[in-house]
Amino acid sequence: NQIAFVKSNPTVCKSLVIDTIDWAERLCIEHICASHNKKGIEDFGYGNGYTYVSEEFGRLLNRLQELVDIGVNVVLTAHAQIKKFEQPDEMGAYDRWELKLGKKTTSQTAPLVKEWCDLLLFCNYKTHVVATDDKGKKHKAQGGTRVMYTEHHPAWDAKNRHGLPFEVPLAYGSIAHIFERQEQSPQSNPTPVQ
């Protein structure tokens, strides 16, 4: 309902923030179960419930894209979780940060979100490691700064379609120029070919 309201009244806000997309996924699952009179998503049998989630989540992203198309910025926040990642051609596994979506739905909904967005930023606390002894054999982490990573890394997913540097300070000023550029560019509505 909120998306439809903003679409009908695009001057009501410049940005719509969904905090968080993992909770939106839970609401999506509850909506699907209530619509089909099911107690849980697995009650559909043969994985059909997860297909419904993927389809409904795709419809949500389509509705959000309609807002983007009329000049409203859409921001999706998400929690992250560490998962063990193992590549067949590598020796051993390593930890990797991923979107925290449902255990059985993440393989379908996470790619939809990642493909849809223009910016996928990974926020982290960058610590500084210093030697604590004269020989430089003992180290400790101290201080640090909050940063946003804008490009893919083995330890996290990130992307940007705006040419941002690999790492930027966790501050609106780091990405403000993207939104200012979008506000200045006129919205063009191409004439359909007859």
Sequence positions of predicted segments:
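Nucleotide-state-sensitive switch-loop elements of NTP-binding domains
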Residues: 1-14
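Conserved acidic residues
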Residues: 14, 72-73, 117-118
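Short, conserved beta-strand edge motifs with alternating hydrophobic and charged residues
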Residues: 17, 75-79, 121-123
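Walker B catalytic acidic pair
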Residues: 20
